[in-house]
From Swiss-Prot:
It comes from the Bacteria. GO terms for molecular function: structural constituent of ribosome. It comes from Finegoldia magna (strain ATCC 29328 / DSM 20472 / WAL 2508) (Peptostreptococcus magnus). One of its GO terms (cellular component) is ribosome. Keywords: Ribonucleoprotein, Ribosomal protein. This is Large ribosomal subunit protein bL33. One of its GO terms (biological process) is translation. NCBIfam families: PRK00504.1 (NF001764), PRK00595.1 (NF001860), rpmG_bact (TIGR01023). Belongs to the bacterial ribosomal protein bL33 family. Pfam families: Ribosomal_L33.
Length: 49
């Protein structure tokens, strides 16, 4: 089953992106480099719980 996860910017703490993942196959947290429109640069975004 795929669950909705929210990605949060590590610098400004704004929650910019939502995505889906299969938590049974990938139990670890998602970390990706994405563009933050508030910081106006690419930053690391982590999954929130």
């Amino acid at each position: 089953m795929r669950d909705k996860v929210i990605l949060e910017c590590t610098e400004c703490k704004s929650r910019n992106y939502t995505t889906k993942k299969n938590k049974k196959l990938h139990p670890d947290r998602v970390e990706t480099n994405k563009y933050c429109k508030f910081c106006k640069k690419h930053t690391l975004h982590k999954e929130t719980r």
